[in-house]
């Protein structure tokens, strides 16, 4: 199996305050993982570290990280409110070779095509989350990390998210979901990391 992230002593925190201590973790391409735990248990911190977006203290942890395409949909929106949806797509996919027809088809699938010229700042929280999921679908990274995947999504949005997860499983791409409890999104799961323990 091919690893994209591994540590035998992952310790994370902010300044001198520990959030995660001595976690042994190894993550493989083409596998699914879930991170669960109560508020404050370190779920967001861990998913940010895995996706290389963590700006806290690693306390000399031994971390192996393979250079790969990885995307994080965090608990806070990452899209730029002063840009339109289409401008955000072009910004986040600037290195990708994706044609306009593909973009239009994906936006249509997520019921966003008629909003592509609208500013993200005018979107509801649910529309912003669906837009981020649509961008993840277009980008199709080898590893997709989603923190609190169901937050802001209505029933249709949850279905669209689950369809994307299923598609990624069939394509052999890794997905990591982080929430207070399992959301049952995966048909097969390599490891569930419970940070309450």
Residue locations for each model-derived region?
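Conserved structural motif at the start of ABC-family nucleotide-binding domains
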Residues: 5-7, 20-22
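ABC ATPase nucleotide-binding domain signature region
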Residues: 50-94, 196
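Catalytic Walker B motif of ABC-type/P-loop ATPase nucleotide-binding domains
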Residues: 144-148, 153
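The feature captures the beta-strand-to-loop junction immediately N-terminal to the Walker
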Residues: 36-38
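Hydrophobic anchor residue at the start of the ABC signature
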Residues: 133
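Conserved ABC ATPase signature
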Residues: 119-126
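Conserved ABC ATPase "signature" region
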Residues: 100-116
């Amino acid at each position: 199996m091919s690893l994209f992230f591994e540590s035998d002593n992952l310790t994370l925190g902010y300044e001198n305050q520990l959030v995660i201590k001595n976690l042994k973790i190894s993550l493989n391409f083409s596998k699914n993982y879930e991170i669960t735990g109560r508020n404050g248990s370190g779920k967001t911190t861990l998913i940010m570290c895995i996706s290389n977006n963590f700006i806290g203290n690693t306390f000399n942890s031994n971390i192996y990280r393979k250079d790969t395409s990885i995307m994080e949909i965090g608990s806070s929106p990452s899209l730029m409110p002063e840009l339109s949806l289409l401008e955000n797509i072009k910004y986040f996919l600037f290195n990708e070779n994706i044609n306009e027809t593909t973009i239009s088809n994906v936006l249509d699938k997520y019921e966003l095509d008629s909003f592509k010229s609208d500013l993200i700042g005018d979107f509801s929280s649910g529309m912003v989350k669906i837009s981020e999921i649509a961008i993840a679908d277009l980008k199709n990274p080898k590893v997709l990390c989603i923190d609190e995947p169901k937050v802001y999504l209505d029933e249709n949005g949850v279905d669209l998210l689950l369809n994307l997860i299923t598609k990624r499983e069939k394509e052999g791409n890794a997905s990591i979901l982080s929430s207070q409890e399992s959301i049952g999104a995966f048909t097969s799961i390599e490891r569930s990391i419970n940070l309450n323990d």
